[in-house]
Amino acid sequence: MPNPGSTSSPGSIPEEIRNLLADVETFVADTLKGENLSKKAKEKRDSLIKKIKDVKSVYPQEFQDKGDAEEGDEYDDPFAGPPDTISLASERYDKDDDGPSDGNQFPPIAAQDLSFVIKAGYLEKRRKDHSFLGFEWQKRWCALSKTVFYYYGSDKDKQQKGEFAIEGYDVRMNNTLRKDAKKDCCFEICAPDKRIYQFTAASPKDAEEWVQQLKFILQDMGSDVIPEDEDEKGDLYDDVDHPVPVSSPQRSQPIDDEIYEELPEEEEDTASVKMDEQGKGSRDSVQHPSGDKSTDYANFYQGLWDCTGSLSDELSFKRGDVIYILSKEYNRYGWWVGEMQGAIGLVPKAYLMEMYDI
């Protein structure tokens, strides 16, 4: 009779036990990693992890090294049975494309070292559990940095668990991902023939904010230059593109030669004065839309996040900086014209919040 404690010739482990051990390892090593545990709980967690590793070392043929892959997202369980209906329907959500992987396209970076973070916070990320437990949501600290979506175990991690460039993707709310109280907190980032990423936010409002910020960046990526409406362009630059016509004495007849007689130089001077007055009036109307800037509280805004202008006509500002809005004529494109410390330029309205509650 074989000795249960012997490790010289270990037998095979039943599939149910392997799956259960994989579930326990995922829960202890990954799920509890981002939780605030007591000292005693942490010691117990470390002890369980060590025991699991010992078992896997005794039965190396039963377990394959999954490396640093992201909790089952980046590999297939070699011990999983034939895929059921749920697995087949969800395969596209949980495995990478046949081409290059979405992950590991960017160098490792600590969560605290990310720059130009537009939106960040804890989300539940959906993954495929390669066992009888089916799907599972795991807590992840996510950050949208420029055009890359990063996800970490926590905001203290020194390296991301995964990331993907959002270019080519679309984002939308999806209340069919869950059947519990969080069903209205779900959204997904998807694209044809690409892996789908699904998340659950803390509240419906937080989920909508993620969707809005992602949509704003995706729309902004579609055009490097802000389009101009021809009518608006004509109205704004009417005094430059269409100068006041100067009549020539050779081509027109004076109304009354005896009363009105102007030399060409005088007509040109008069036209120049009119153009200067019109230009000055236009500038005054733009810089002071409400008359008195000092009391025009409705047009004072402050930065929600740091923003670095990529073009010369864009303002750069930091979170909390005060910006006075001169014009909202590009509102349809998500941009306003603002002034900060004497500098005037375009500012993304999504990066601003009202300074005064009027």
UniProtKB/Swiss-Prot annotation:
Its main location: cytoplasm. Residues 116-219 form the PH domain. The keyword Nucleus does not apply. The modification Phosphotyrosine is found at residues 75, 151, 197, 260. Residues 296-357 form the SH3 domain. One of its GO terms (biological process) is B cell activation. Keywords: B-cell activation, Cytoplasm, Phosphoprotein, SH3 domain. Residues 60-108, 227-293 are annotated as: Disordered. The modification Phosphoserine is found at residues 6, 9, 87, 90, 223, 272, 282, 285. The SH3 domain interacts with FYB1 and PTK2B. May be involved in B-cell and macrophage adhesion processes. In B-cells, may act by coupling the B-cell receptor (BCR) to integrin activation. May play a role in src signaling pathway. Interacts with FYB1, which is required for SKAP2 protein stability. Interacts with PTPNS1. Part of a complex consisting of SKAP2, FYB1 and PTPNS1. Part of a complex consisting of SKAP2, FYB1 and LILRB3. Interacts with LAT, GRB2, PTK2B, and PRAM1. May interact with actin. May interact with FYN, HCK and LYN. Interacts with FASLG. This is Src kinase-associated phosphoprotein 2. It comes from Rattus norvegicus (Rat).
